[in-house]
Each structure stands twice: as C-alpha cells, then as structure tokens.
Amino acid sequence: MFDLAIFALSMMLLAVTVFAKIRLRDWWLRACEFPRVQIACLAALTAALATVTDDPWRAYSLTASLSVLAVQQLKAAEPGHEDRCVPLLVSNVLTPNRNSQGLITQILEHQPDIVLTLETDDWWGEKLQSALGEGWPEIVSVPQDNLYGMHLFSRLELQGLEVKRLIQDDIPSIHGWIILKSGERIRLHALHPRPPSPQESDTSLWRDAELLLVGKEIREHAGPSLLIGDLNDVAWSRTTKLFTRVSGMLDPRRGRGMFSTFHAGHRLLRWPLDHIFVTEHFTLGQMQRLKEFGSDHFPILATLCYHPSRSDENDTPRPDAEDKADVKETIH
C-alpha cells in the first residue's frame, strides 16, 4: 500500500508537469505551470520516501519524481557608478486593501527612484500622490476600478511617456524613457496583463499576446530596457521563457532565489508573479521581497545598474525559427 501511494503521488506530479507542457491556452492548463516549487518539494519528498522500500516500483517512482525537478542569471553589480543605477519598487496593492500607509512607509524607508503600483483606483492614487508627490514629482496616473489601474512615480526625469492599451481597451500599460543621473536613457515598459482564470479569461491569449508584443518591440529597439509589473505568470512558464528569448531580456532572480510575491496570505501557495526583467546592458545591485501590507502581493525591490561594458558577461537568450512562428501566431 505504501509503495502504491508513492507511485500514485509520483504519477500525479508527473501528470501536472506534463499538463503544463501542453501547448494550449486553456486557463486550467496554464494554471498547472504555477506550482513548480510545491511540485518540486513533493517530488523530492516522494523520491526520499521511495528509497526506503525495496519494491521494484521504487525506480519508476524515483525517475518520475526527479523528472519534474529543474534550475539558472544576471551578473552582480560592482561598487561605484551609483549615478547609473536605478532602485525600483513594484507593488500590486489589491484595490480593496486600504492600508496605504503600510506601503508608503516602505517606500519612504527604501527610497527607490522608481515606484510602480498596480490595481490602483482613484482612492489609492490620491493617497499615494499626497504622500509621494513632493519626493517623486514625475507621475503617471492611470486610476481604474477594474483591478487594472496603475501609477508610476519617479525621482528621475521621464520622457516620451505613453499610456497604451495594446490588446484590450480596459488594460493599460506605460511606456517611455528614464533619464539616469548620468544622463543616459533607458527604455521602460510597465505591464499588468489580464490573467487566464475563470473570472478573467478562459485562455491565456490576451496575456501572452501583450507580453510577446512588448517583447518583440524590445528586441527591435536593441537598446537598454527594463520591463516591470505584475505579469500574471510565473518565471518558468512556456510564455515567459518565450518572452525572454524573443525580447533578449534576463531575469535577475535566476540563481538567487524565487522572490515569490503572490499570495501573501498563503505561505505554502506562493509564486513569483511580479517581475523585473532587464536587457543584457544591466547588472544587479540588490533584490529583495518587502513586507506584507494587506495586499495579496508582496512588494518587490531591486537595484539595476546600467553597465553596457559588461554585456558580454550575460548570456542573452535568443529566439529560434519556431519561437518567431509562435510569436506571429499569438500576436496575429
């Protein structure tokens, strides 16, 4: 019975992993991509338990368990050249959450140059602008009451800012240029695409199309770029990995930790949904998840440093012909 239970658990974990690999956009299949850490922990436990029995099923169970395990990065910044570094904070506030002071206190403590808040309505916009408007005078305000509002606050000069609705009229995104203290220009994209879920969308098409459309633009721009936001997707999903190859962007978390930002209320069910992606022109100063403040997301804080001379140290992902075909099919 013990051996059968181990084998059944192994097969269940393998099934969820296989479902996540199926190239369809149904929400329940895409949901299978999220719990990789939980699956990995259960797989490791199953593998360990399988070693205590001499039953021939052990080898099959162990193989199935280990087949769902896997890993990988952006170079660390060196001291100096602070005028080329951008400390930034990203936070999904959860619209009905009214603990604005919990977030504002953390912003004032860490003093990031860029603050992006998501799910912000008029109430949140007023609270944040009242507290941050003097210290972060460059503001892009897009309040909405549909969970897709966003506000951008900056101490650095911003240029050429546009609020776009790339795929759907009720889903905004922010695009423009950050002017570093050194005078150099960095392209910025801030996104919060609609997720695949029973309440939002039956498929992941809208999310995937928005992400890949911006990724294609980043690749064509070819200059230094940052992409930040709640992407409603995990770092290891097929779509996010396709995005990194198409855009050429790197994930600072790889090789450093999960930095899971959602769900703040469920310790065992957390995934990294809030992202900071960078092109090869950057190095990482520091990265950390901040404190819970009543939202279902934790804020995330990172310092990215513009060091184009170190671009060759980073392993920039590149798309193949199949990737390009996938992008064309998704966008069109």
Functional labels for PLM-detected ranges:
Residues 84, 94-108, 116-332:
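Soluble catalytic domains of enzymes that build or remodel membrane lipids, polysaccharides, and related
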Residues 3-6, 30, 55-62:
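Short, aromatic-rich membrane-interface segments at the entry and exit
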Residues 52, 58-110, 126-130:
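N-terminal signal-anchor transmembrane helix
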Residues 29-45:
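Loop-to-helix transition at the N-terminal end of transmembrane alpha-helices
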Residues 46-54:
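Hydrophobic alpha-helical transmembrane segments
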Residues 8-25:
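N-terminal signal-anchor/start-transfer transmembrane helix
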Residues 113:
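Short acidic/polar active-site loop segments enriched in Thr and Asp
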